[in-house]
């Protein structure tokens, strides 16, 4: 049983800008796992931080928790044009993930936002909510625990899924469905098909490909992920996801790519490499759990 005092102690780590970013991320993911109003309140407090990377992760976690009590905060973040595009995008995606139709109108309103990543995100979230209404709830559980911005396509043939993924004339929602079906299929052929998506036109799409390759953790995608991370002309949101994917895949070539960009002039890339190197250590070490805020707290001397 977790006490209110323990939740507060983990929350204090999250909102403390003097704490190392890795410790704050671990605290965030611990709060996400614990859930409840206390965790939501602490996560919501951190949206005035100056790290876009952290704030985007806050929104992601609130969406994954699927707790409607987070909706007002996420709507505020989506509407706040002072927030970075990657933060507003993640708030829009989180509203879709929670799955409550009460946000349909606000998502439709922001589907024509001047920031293309925000507009495309809200369009996808509207399609997801409409799909949930048409199909009577969430898609059947797959091999991954994440709440995705689109349900996987029913098609199982990797070649046909690759074709759908890369066809830029198709609706983004259909291409996302192909993306998640490829992730669920797994294996080298699917990983290589997904990696081709890192060259498609939409930055939002490319960033989601990076995220999915991090979930898949197949080393066949490492060269393409490392190349995208190294492209200084690439959207920072895409480079960030590629960095975190390399941290999750955790092969020696990933380490070299992450270390090469640990001092990148783009803050969100630099911080992503910092977090990814921490993930790399976790993946290659003996620690059982990445979201270890509670274990750290209980193991600390009183």
Curated annotation (Swiss-Prot):
Positions contributing to Fe cation 2 binding: 89-90, 207
InterPro entries: ARM-like, ARM-type_fold, Deoxyhypusine_hydroxylase, HEAT_type_2, PBS_lyase_HEAT
Result after altering residue 90 to A: Loss of deoxyhypusine monooxygenase activity. Loss of iron-binding
Main enzyme class: oxidoreductase
Pfam families: HEAT_2
Protein's UniProt name: Deoxyhypusine hydroxylase
Outcome reported for the amino acid change (mutating residue 237 to L): Decreased iron-binding. Loss of iron-binding
Sorted UniProt keywords: Acetylation, Disease variant, Hypusine biosynthesis, Intellectual disability, Iron, Metal-binding, Monooxygenase, Oxidoreductase, Repeat
Influence of pH: Optimum pH is 8-8.5 at 37 degrees Celsius.
Clinical disorder: Neurodevelopmental disorder with microcephaly, cerebral atrophy, and visual impairment: An autosomal recessive disorder characterized by global developmental delay, intellectual disability, facial dysmorphism, and microcephaly.
């Amino acid at each position: 049983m977790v006490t209110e005092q323990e939740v507060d102690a983990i929350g204090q780590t999250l909102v403390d800008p003097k704490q190392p970013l890795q410790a704050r991320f671990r605290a965030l993911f611990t709060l996400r796992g614990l859930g409840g109003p206390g965790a939501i309140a602490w996560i919501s407090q951190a949206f005035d931080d100056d790290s876009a990377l952290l704030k985007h992760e806050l929104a992601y976690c609130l969406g994954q928790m699927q707790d409607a009590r987070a909706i007002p905060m996420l709507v505020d973040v989506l509407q706040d044009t002072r927030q970075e595009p990657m933060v507003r995008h993640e708030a829009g995606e989180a509203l879709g993930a929670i799955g409550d139709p009460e946000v349909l109108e606000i998502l439709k309103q922001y589907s024509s936002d001047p920031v293309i990543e925000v507009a495309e995100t809200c369009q996808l979230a509207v399609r997801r909510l409409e799909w949930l209404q048409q199909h009577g709830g969430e898609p059947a559980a797959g091999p991954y625990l994440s709440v995705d911005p689109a349900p996987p396509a029913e098609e199982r043939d990797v070649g046909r899924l690759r074709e759908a993924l890369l066809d830029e004339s198709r609706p983004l929602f259909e291409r996302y469905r192909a993306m998640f079906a490829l992730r669920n299929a797994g294996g080298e052929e699917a990983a290589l098909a997904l990696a081709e998506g890192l060259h498609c036109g939409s930055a939002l799409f490319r960033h989601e490909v990076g995220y999915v390759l991090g979930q898949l953790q197949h080393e066949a995608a490492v060269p393409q992920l490392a190349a995208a991370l190294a492209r200084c002309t690439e959207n920072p949101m895409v480079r960030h996801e590629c960095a975190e994917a390399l941290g999750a895949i955790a092969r020696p070539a990933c380490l070299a790519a992450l270390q090469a960009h640990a001092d990148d002039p783009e803050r969100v890339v630099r911080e992503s490499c910092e977090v990814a190197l921490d993930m790399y250590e976790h993946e290659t070490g003996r620690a059982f759990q990445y979201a270890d805020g509670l274990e750290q707290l209980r193991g600390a001397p009183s």
